[in-house]
């Protein structure tokens, strides 16, 4: 077995991965706040951590992957007001758009995709524990976490409290005992979402959402917590504080993994700067696999400069790889050097370089190298289409909609997505997935606890 190494933000060094339970690796990744289409910067962690999960599944017998959806937030309230639609209409449509983008990018579906609004009781319970233990206090109908009570606060970001406050958008309100204290629960007016609680009608703060949901699905202490580097402070710092204090634990997660920014003209791509490009818009003239490849070309911790040329070059690279594996199907183990590269802190540039070496040898007649390349493609999440379809549709999003040659992995991904839709009572989406598979002559058979499929 290849030894997996990951850069741990908490320790500020590359560390060997030592799982809590090798029989079940547990990973939590911060998901989207659902008020708009995701942009290419949002897509980077989705793709990178998807590769990490694929590597983990290659190395270990079971991986429990949780990625949340934040569907209660002031940005959501404001956007619904601007569009003059209900909040549920906005969030349901945005979640559907998000799932469509993830499918186009070739991402696996997490085992659990909890929504914040379905876990309010768990959040209230955790807040009650923090108040009881003296880590939180009530002020002006708000519940706040007292950072002075947690002596390890600032350990993840490595900054002093003064630095963190001055360098962030922390709201310094007069009801706070300390400027760095953060909201666990806040009151809601009649025109915005709210839930009954011991502190009156209100809604949760952002940070408590992830603490409550990760605890429910992964427990007090799990292996990996992942997210963008912009989440280190305050989000992840605050998650650690409230989780450790509520759960009487020294660690929330053993490994904290963060990806770097995507830049446009040298600036971080973000919605606040308005210099972003949504995946939805990119798919009008490209395909998800080329976008995915683009996001794998730089090491995940380094900044990634993105532009139209980036996708064009990715498309050419994929064409070269598809040509090399023409006629081959996955049959056997992945190339050990590619797996070794990915096990070395998810070094996708090295893995892609190795893939192109194998393609060179395959194009010179080496069937062994062609087979190794095809066998390795699923770990990177590429080359899932037939070569014929790629060269027919690869320059457009039509390839994302062509299901005539759907493979087993794609079928299982769609079945899991349908399962999540049914759990979320989104029966319309569940029926759409069933109908999509039926067009490919795939018949689903639902049984208690499992869905089987067969070709008609």
Where are these regions (language model features)?
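Short catalytic-loop micro-motif centered on adjacent basic/acidic residues
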Residues: 110-114, 225-227, 363-367
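N-terminal, positively charged nucleic-acid-binding surface of large information/translation enzymes
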Residues: 11-14, 20-106, 444-446, 453
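Short Gly/Ser/Thr- and Asp/Glu-enriched loop/turn motifs at secondary-structure junctions
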Residues: 109, 139-140, 446-450
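Structural preference for alpha-helix termini/caps and helix-kink/transition segments
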Residues: 268-456
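Acidic carboxylate-rich catalytic motifs and surrounding loops in phosphoryl-/glycosyl-chemistry enzymes
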Residues: 67, 112-118, 142, 259
């Amino acid at each position: 077995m290849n030894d997996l190494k990951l850069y741990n933000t908490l320790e500020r060094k590359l560390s060997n991965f030592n799982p809590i339970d090798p029989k079940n690796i547990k990973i939590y990744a911060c998901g989207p706040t659902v008020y708009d289409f995701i942009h290419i910067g949002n897509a980077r962690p989705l793709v990178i951590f998807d590769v990490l999960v694929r590597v983990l599944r290659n190395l270990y017998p079971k991986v429990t992957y949780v990625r949340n959806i934040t569907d209660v937030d002031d940005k959501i309230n404001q956007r619904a007001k601007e569009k003059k639609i209900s909040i549920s209409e906005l969030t349901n449509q945005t979640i559907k758009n998000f799932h469509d983008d993830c499918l186009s990018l070739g991402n696996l579906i997490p085992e659990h995709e909890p929504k914040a609004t379905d876990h309010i009781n768990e959040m209230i319970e955790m807040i009650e524990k923090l108040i009881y233990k003296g880590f939180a206090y009530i002020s002006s109908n708000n519940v706040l976490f007292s950072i002075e009570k947690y002596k390890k606060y600032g350990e993840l970001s490595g900054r002093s409290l003064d630095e963190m406050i001055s360098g962030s958008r922390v709201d310094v309100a007069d009801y706070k005992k300390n400027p760095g204290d953060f909201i666990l629960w806040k009151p809601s007016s009649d025109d915005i979402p709210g839930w009954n609680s011991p502190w009156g009608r209100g809604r949760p703060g952002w940070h408590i959402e992830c603490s409550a949901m990760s605890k429910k699905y992964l427990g007090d202490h799990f292996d990996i917590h992942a997210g963008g580097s912009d989440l280190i402070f305050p989000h992840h710092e605050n998650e650690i504080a409230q989780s450790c204090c509520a759960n009487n634990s020294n660690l929330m997660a053993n490994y904290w993994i963060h990806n770097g920014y995507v830049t446009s003209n040298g600036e971080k791509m973000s919605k606040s700067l308005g210099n972003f490009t949504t995946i939805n818009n990119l798919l009008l003239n490209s395909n998800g696999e080329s976008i995915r490849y683009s996001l794998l070309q730089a090491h995940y911790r380094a900044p990634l400069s993105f532009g139209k040329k980036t996708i064009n070059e990715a498309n050419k690279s994929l064409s070269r790889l598809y040509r090399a594996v023409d006629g081959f199907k996955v049959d056997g183990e992945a190339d050990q050097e590619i797996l070794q590269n990915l096990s070395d802190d998810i070094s996708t540039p090295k893995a892609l370089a190795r893939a192109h070496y194998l393609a060179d040898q395959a194009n010179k007649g080496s069937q062994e190298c062609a087979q190794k390349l095809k066998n390795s493609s699923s770990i990177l999440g590429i080359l899932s289409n037939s070569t014929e379809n790629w060269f027919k549709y690869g320059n457009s999003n039509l390839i994302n909609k062509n299901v005539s040659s759907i493979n087993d992995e794609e079928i299982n991904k769609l079945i899991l997505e349908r399962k999540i839709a049914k759990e979320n009572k989104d029966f319309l989406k569940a029926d759409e997935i069933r109908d999509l598979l039926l067009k490919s002559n795939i018949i689903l058979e639902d049984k208690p606890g499992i869905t089987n499929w067969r070709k008609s």
